[in-house]
């Protein structure tokens, strides 16, 4: 049985191609066939599995990112219990020409109805779910590809012959014709920003390393992580200094870097755009490389959004693969399965522009992706063009995660707008109170839980809501009100479904806040920490649909207005123009403040959520409360407070903050403190100056 597979490998190596072999059956049978092939074919045989056989070179799929920059001959991916699609894409990208990738799956007909353990990572469900839509999509792609080999248990192996191909010339380390052409342009650059995009395996990082070795002056390198720049550094040797992006910006702000000729930014689309913009200002020349598509997301959104803000930039691209032949069968089937192809990423020719009022806004559910694969390609492709963080994990959510809702803007067959919403809420009051107190954070419910955990609105998770996860409009149709029309359609549908509100979470900018305001949303929260992905503070907004949703929205917005004076001092962004603030700022301690303070002192609410109430508390007590005053009023770094007070780590500092908050409350009104603490208290002992210590316990 194994001889045809073994016999085909020399021809595959000669042609520079790789192929996919699917072993479908009972897990023991599939693994045994893989072991037999491993014994007959020499190679590295990297095995990705949670339960690999003894004696194999194995790694868990969850650790697949450690493989970036490696190359292997042959691999096995065990998907008998669950399919980590990003890990599959990663291992496929590490395989050299001449490799077989063995994919172990359940029995073919049963596979779509089998619960997938990998769904625990992305479905926000407590138990594995059936992912029939995505698995059937995979099966269609596998069966449609003539170079994919499907070997089912109790059925004979039929190995399709490899078509005639020219012999493949393995790269010898010198630049390809495409690389040489681009390298010559870069070597002649006096100044400017160059953006190099390519699919994986095209040699863009190698080209960046070649620039370092050929350039006579100094070049610095940065990227989302040192592992991501491994190929570049291998090519450049010791000539390029690597910096973490935030450390590089800090250095540039304090030192003269005018003697550095080039800044090379590998996988630039994975770095927050505000950080990128700040870095580019310090260097006369910059080369930014990014992947057009892949398991980390698509760089097309990066091109459309970030590069459009640059004054002087030049787009470069590499199309020819280096590590395998053109039209490689494994790359082709992986691209089809994960909708990676460029022509699928929203680049369909658009029909003649009709009046905006004639654009259709249909609503979709997941069964529509199953019944209309082309619609799925166009909808997902548009999301991929607009959002760098759109990954295969999003494709799995979109197709199978519970509680997903979609709408599109369509002109004939073209999808020019896409909107994706997620169900949230419906938690019990007891669980919602635990979320507010910081004791529980169940899966999902991003905005609903955040309003409880950070904005004091404990009831938010008990209401029914839908969160806007993604919204996109193709570039040629923007500024036409299409996004607002899609949101209005979903607003009407959600109201019919008895939802209390729509919500959205976004990286705060004045432009985005204005957009959501025009869509009818009201700003209810701005966080105190910047998002790693956007470099912006997290903002949340609500659009109420019911009296309960209206009451929540008013309470949350009023809380934001009341707290803004203190929050703005912490984050330093301008006040949103539509946030009408009280004058002068509120300093009285209200019942809401007492509840918030009790949640911090006697439960597990984070200091960031309780910061405004704590600031008001400090104005009402003359107690020293040195740990709180140093941090909140004097802005002393936490490490300095820990050293000054002789504490052992941050955990001890947080415990002291909570103790001081309790002491301050007790000094002002001990009875009110006790009443406020009862609903959420953990076991606590409060030192009362001049009185016995007070123990509060709900055990």
Curated annotation (Swiss-Prot):
Q: Which GO terms describe its biological process?
A: rRNA acetylation involved in maturation of SSU-rRNA; tRNA acetylation; tRNA wobble cytosine modification
Kindly list the places in or outside the cell where this protein is found, as annotated in its UniProt entry: Cytoplasm
Query: GO cellular-component terms in the record?
Result: cytoplasm
**EC number(s) per entry:** 2.3.1.193
- Please list the reactions this protein catalyses: cytidine(34) in elongator tRNA(Met) + acetyl-CoA + ATP + H2O = N(4)-acetylcytidine(34) in elongator tRNA(Met) + ADP + phosphate + CoA + H(+)
InterPro entries given in the database record:
Acyl_CoA_acyltransferase, GNAT_dom, NAT10/TcmA_helicase, P-loop_NTPase, TmcA/NAT10/Kre33, TmcA_C_sf, TmcA_N, TmcA_tRNA_bind
- What region holds the N-acetyltransferase domain? 359-543
Q: Which residues make up the binding site for ATP?
A: 179, 201-210, 323
State its role: Catalyzes the formation of N(4)-acetylcytidine (ac(4)C) at the wobble position of tRNA(Met), by using acetyl-CoA as an acetyl donor and ATP (or GTP).
What protein does this entry describe?
tRNA(Met) cytidine acetyltransferase TmcA
The root-end lineage is: Bacteria, Pseudomonadati, Pseudomonadota, Gammaproteobacteria, Enterobacterales
Query: What is the gene called?
Result: tmcA
């Amino acid at each position: 049985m194994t001889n045809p597979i073994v016999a085909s490998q020399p021809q595959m190596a000669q042609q520079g191609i790789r192929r996919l072999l699917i072993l479908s059956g009972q897990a023991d049978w599939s693994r045994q066939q893989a072991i037999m092939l491993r014994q007959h074919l020499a190679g590295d045989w990297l095995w990705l599995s949670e339960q690999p056989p003894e004696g194999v070179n194995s790694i868990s799929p969850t650790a697949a990112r450690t493989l970036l920059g490696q190359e292997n001959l042959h691999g096995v991916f065990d998907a008998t219990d669950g399919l980590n699609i990003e890990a599959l894409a990663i291992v496929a990208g590490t395989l050299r020409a001449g490799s077989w990738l063995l994919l172990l799956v359940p029995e073919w007909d049963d596979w779509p109805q089998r619960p997938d353990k990998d769904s625990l990572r992305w479905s926000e469900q407590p138990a594995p779910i059936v992912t029939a839509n995505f698995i059937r999509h995979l099966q269609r792609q596998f069966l449609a590809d003539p170079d994919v080999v499907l070997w089912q248990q109790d059925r004979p192996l039929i190995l399709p012959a490899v078509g005639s191909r020219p012999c493949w010339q393995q790269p010898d380390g010198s630049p390809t014709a495409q690389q040489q052409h681009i390298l010559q342009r870069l070597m002649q650059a006096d100044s400017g920003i160059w953006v190099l995009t390519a699919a994986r395996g095209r040699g863009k990082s190698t080209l960046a390393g070649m620039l370092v070795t050929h350039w006579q002056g100094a070049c610095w390198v940065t990227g989302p992580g040192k592992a991501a720049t491994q190929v570049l550094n291998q090519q450049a040797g010791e000539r390029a200094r690597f910096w973490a992006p935030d450390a590089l910006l800090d250095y540039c702000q304090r030192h003269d870097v005018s003697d550095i000729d080039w800044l090379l930014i590998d996988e630039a689309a994975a770095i927050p755009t505000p950080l990128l913009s700040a870095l580019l200002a310090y260097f006369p020349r910059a080369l930014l490389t990014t992947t057009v598509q892949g398991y980390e997301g698509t760089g097309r959104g990066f091109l459309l959004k970030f590069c459009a803000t640059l004054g002087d930039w030049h787009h470069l691209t590499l199309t020819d693969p280096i590590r395998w032949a053109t039209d490689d069968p494994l790359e082709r089937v992986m691209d089809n399965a994960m909708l990676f192809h460029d022509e699928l990423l929203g680049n369909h020719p658009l029909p003649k522009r009709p009046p905006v009022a004639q654009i259709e806004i249909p609503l979709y559910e997941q069964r529509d992706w199953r019944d209309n694969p082309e619609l799925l390609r166009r909808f997902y492709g548009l999301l991929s063009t607009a959002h760098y963080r759109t990954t295969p994990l999003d494709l799995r959510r979109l197709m199978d995660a519970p509680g997903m809702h979609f709408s599109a803007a369509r002109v004939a067959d073209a999808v020019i707008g896409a909107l994706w919403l997620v169900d949230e809420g419906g938690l019990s009051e007891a669980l919602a109170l635990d979320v507010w107190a910081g004791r529980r954070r169940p899966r999902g419910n991003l905005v609903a839980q955040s309003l409880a955990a950070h904005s004091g609105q404990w009831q938010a998770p008990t209401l029914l809501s839908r969160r806007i996860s993604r919204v996109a409009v193709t570039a040629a149709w923007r500024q036409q009100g299409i996004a607002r029309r899609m949101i209005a359609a979903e607003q009407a549908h959600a109201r019919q479904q008895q939802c209390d509100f729509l919500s959205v979470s976004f990286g705060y900018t004045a432009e985005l806040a204005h957009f959501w305001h025009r869509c009818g949303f009201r700003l209810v929260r701005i966080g105190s920490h910047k998002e790693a992905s956007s470099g912006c503070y997290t903002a949340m907004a609500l659009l109420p649909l019911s009296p309960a949703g209206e009451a929540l929205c008013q309470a949350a917005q009023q809380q934001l207005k009341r707290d803004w004076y203190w929050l703005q001092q912490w984050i330093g962004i301008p006040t949103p123009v539509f946030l009408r603030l009280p004058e002068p700022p509120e300093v009285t301690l209200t019942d809401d403040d007492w509840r918030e303070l009790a949640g911090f002192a006697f439960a597990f609410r984070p200091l960031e959520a309780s910061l405004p109430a704590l600031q008001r508390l400090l104005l009402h007590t003359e107690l020293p409360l040195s740990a709180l005053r140093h941090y909140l009023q004097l802005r002393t770094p936490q490490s300095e407070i820990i050293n000054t007070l002789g504490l052992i780590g941050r955990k001890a500092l947080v415990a002291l903050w909570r103790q001081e908050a309790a002491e301050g409350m007790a000094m002002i009104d001990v009875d009110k403190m006790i009443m406020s603490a009862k609903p959420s208290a953990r076991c606590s002992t409060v030192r009362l100056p001049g009185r016995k210590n007070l123990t509060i316990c709900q055990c």
